[in-house]
């Protein structure tokens, strides 16, 4: 991924850094929400789910070599570099939006009710004949998956083809603010989806 320091990240997510200040100039090598994927140099984002709280895995990921972690909890309980935020999920989106804007890359955003994935695959296939393309993989098309896809972008990529799925009011605006698409493709919308677009 393109260079991004903990200082950049702290500012992007409006957080407060806790730990050795010399770490602020260090660059992360990736971002993970899954403790099993938190490799050396990564920033860990501990999300809270219905049954699992990612904060419980912070000691594990730091042992694996992660550079720092976000946290919603009392940072004084941690001995590792951390960025305290109100919401790790929102911080994930804010950091992704910041990262996307650091890249000189064209983004094609695709949304709709039916046909998003096939349209994404077709567009990515055509563009890849000329450009280095990154596309959304699997179902990584929501407020968590989209940021993770964006973090996979490098300076070698020329185009990103990003699928954006929406299921609640305001989500389209939220996803667009993260991806900042240069080109928008809207495929078929059903009457059930229309109320969620705004």
Identify the function of each model-found stretch.
Residues 1-94:
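N-terminal leader/targeting and accessory segments in enzymes
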Residues 91-192:
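Phosphate-binding loop of NTP-binding sites
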């Amino acid at each position: 991924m393109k260079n991004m320091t903990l200082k950049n990240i702290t500012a992007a997510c409006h957080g407060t850094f806790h730990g050795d200040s010399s770490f602020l100039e260090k660059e992360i090598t990736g971002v993970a929400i899954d403790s099993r994927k938190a490799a050396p140099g990564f920033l860990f984002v501990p999300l809270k789910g219905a049954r699992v709280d990612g904060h419980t895995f912070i000691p594990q990921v730091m042992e694996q070599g992660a550079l720092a972690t976000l946290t919603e909890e009392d940072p004084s309980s941690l001995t590792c570099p951390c960025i305290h935020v109100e919401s790790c999920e929102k911080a994930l989106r804010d950091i992704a939006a910041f990262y996307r804007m650091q890249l000189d890359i064209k983004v094609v955003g695709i949304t709709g009710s039916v046909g998003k994935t096939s349209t994404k695959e077709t567009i990515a296939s055509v563009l890849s004949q000329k450009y280095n393309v990154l596309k959304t993989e699997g179902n990584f098309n929501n407020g968590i998956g989209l940021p993770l896809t964006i973090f996979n972008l490098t300076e070698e990529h020329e185009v990103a083809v990003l699928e954006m799925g929406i299921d609640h009011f305001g989500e389209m605006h939220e996803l667009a603010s993260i991806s900042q698409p240069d080109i928008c493709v809207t495929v078929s919308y059903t009457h059930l989806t229309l109320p969620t677009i705004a």
